């Protein structure tokens, strides 16, 4: 099919080339032979009057013109997919849909297992691909390459819809044999102790307590940096180091390890966990179904947490 002289099938080829950055892989993705894909590249170059890609080894390197075309083409194809091709009613019990979700190890351990267990009962053929924090998460959302982000709301952009899940607080943790934690933790002690700190993504973004400390002109003595909160407790065992992590995750590890939970000596801010999805998938029936489950399970967990907190204070 042509539109103003452009074979629209070429847009599918260009999208695959931008995603895969390899001629053979792109051809395989859209079920073309390699010669057919090479011909598509030649036609794209003629139509747009640009080289579009140069070769670096076996990798295709897009030109600025190709980079500029990538986002609108991806969004147009995604819109067609969701509004025309996939408008049939979504039946969870019969679906084999795969949901790609970026989330932290914290949310995987304390929350998302609930989602997986419930979906296994209601939609046994539905699959999940859980992905680690990415520095490009907003771009992945925009391209429709992930279905959801699940992490602190403050890291989310305003470009896509989102919903809050629950509030979380930060606590300090250390080995139960650490004698420095036998008395109330002071600011001076906290700052002088060796810390295990979680940072995220390839750029090692600082986490919430790090931002708080930097804003107040405070700098900890970080001895170990780990990728994710879940790696903090194992590194603390049999040491005099300290870590800072979400309360729910600390309680999870407290049951399994010699972990001691103490109040931070500083008023570390709480944070809001949220879920975000691509704007293009806002009316997608499968996305709506999954969002409903995520929000319901978040409400159930928040209610159980509040009830437990009330019992402790009675």
UniProtKB/Swiss-Prot annotation:
Any one GO MF annotation of this record: DNA-binding transcription factor activity
Entry annotated with the keyword Nucleus: no
Highest taxon listed in the record's lineage: Bacteria
S-S bonds: none
Annotated ranges, domain HTH lysR-type: 6-63
Keywords for the protein's UniProt record, in alphabetical order: Activator, DNA-binding, Nodulation, Repressor, Transcription, Transcription regulation
Annotation: DNA-binding region: 23-42
Annotated Pfam families: HTH_1, LysR_substrate
InterPro entries documented for this protein: LysR-type_TF, LysR_subst-bd, NodD_PBP2, Tscrpt_reg_HTH_LysR, WH-like_DNA-bd_sf, WH_DNA-bd_sf
Note: There are at least two nodD genes in B.sp strain NC92.
Family indicated by similarity: Belongs to the LysR transcriptional regulatory family.
Function, in words: NodD regulates the expression of the nodABCFE genes which encode other nodulation proteins. NodD is also a negative regulator of its own expression. Binds flavonoids as inducers.
Protein's UniProt name: Nodulation protein D 1
Source taxonomy: Bacteria, Pseudomonadati, Pseudomonadota, Alphaproteobacteria, Hyphomicrobiales
């Amino acid at each position: 099919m042509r539109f103003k002289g452009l074979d629209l099938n070429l847009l599918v080829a260009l999208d695959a080339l931008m995603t895969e950055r390899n001629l053979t892989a792109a051809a395989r993705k859209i079920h073309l032979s390699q010669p057919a894909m090479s011909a598509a590249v030649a036609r794209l170059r003629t139509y747009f009057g640009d080289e579009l890609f140069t070769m670096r080894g076996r990798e295709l390197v897009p030109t600025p013109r190709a980079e500029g075309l990538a986002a609108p083409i991806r969004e147009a194809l995604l819109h067609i997919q969701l509004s025309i091709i996939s408008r049939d009613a979504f039946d969870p019990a019969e679906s084999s849909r795969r949901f790609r979700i970026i989330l932290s190890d914290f949310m995987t351990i304390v929350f998302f297992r609930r989602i997986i267990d419930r979906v296994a009962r209601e939609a046994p053929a539905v699959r999940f691909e859980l992905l680690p924090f990415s520095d490009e998460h907003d771009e992945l959302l925009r391209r429709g390459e992930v279905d959801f982000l699940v992490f602190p709301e403050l890291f989310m952009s305003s470009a896509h819809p989102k919903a809050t899940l629950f509030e979380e607080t930060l606590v300090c943790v250390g080995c139960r044999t650490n004698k420095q934690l036998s008395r109330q933790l002071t600011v001076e002690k906290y700052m002088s102790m060796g810390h295990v700190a979680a940072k995220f993504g390839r750029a090692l973004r600082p986490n919430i307590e790090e931002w708080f400390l930097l804003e107040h002109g405070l700098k900890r003595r970080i001895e170990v940096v780990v990728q994710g909160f879940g790696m903090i407790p194992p590194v603390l065992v049999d040491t005099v180091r300290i870590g800072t992590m979400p309360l729910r995750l600390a309680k999870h590890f407290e049951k399994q390890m010699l972990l001691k939970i103490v109040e931070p000596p500083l008023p570390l801010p709480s944070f809001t966990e949220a879920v975000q999805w691509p704007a293009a998938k806002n009316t997608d029936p499968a996305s709506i179904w999954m969002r409903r489950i995520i929000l319901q399970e978040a409400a159930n967990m928040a209610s159980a947490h509040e009830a437990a907190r009330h019992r402790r204070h009675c």
